[in-house]
A protein has these predicted regions:
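DUTPase catalytic domain/fold
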Residues: 1-136
Length: 136
């Protein structure tokens, strides 16, 4: 996958060869206030493979240890810098230094089927049974 970096940006990397997510880092120090949010421009540009999208997914360690979450969607044709919004669900400010990991990019295949309006769906075993319908 082709990657371009703005000045000061860090090359995405995997912690282990088989990790699904590519770690993205902040090029600048940033504070995410308690119960607040902050926007980080990673300076990373990607040319996603045809038929794929990129999901920005929280780093599990940041989520579990520091209550920091993130999410986002990068469409195949987007080549601008990846920007992520970090949410702090905890009661203390969280400081990131330049070079710290802030989120991870997971590249996934996407099916883009044409839409067709219908008046009813074919019957399925589950139907429209939702929350709690399968029991405990």
């Amino acid at each position: 996958m082709e990657i371009m970096l703005d000045d000061g940006a860090y090359m995405p990397s995997r912690g282990h060869r088989t990790d699904a997510g590519l770690d993205l880092r902040t090029p600048k120090a940033v504070t995410v206030p308690a119960y607040g949010s902050a926007i980080v421009d990673t300076g990373v540009h990607v040319a996603l493979p045809h038929g794929c999208a990129g999901l920005l997914v929280s780093k599990s360690g940041l989520n579990v240890r520091h209550d920091i979450t993130s999410t986002g969607l990068i469409d195949e044709g987007y080549t601008g810098s990846i920007v992520v919004k970090l949410y702090n669900h905890g009661g203390e400010d969280h400081e990131f230094e330049a070079g710290d990991k802030v989120t991870q990019l997971v590249v996934i295949p996407v099916v883009c089927e044409p839409l067709e309006r219908v008046s009813a769906f074919n019957a399925t075993e589950r139907g429209d049974n939702g929350f709690g319908s399968t029991g405990r």
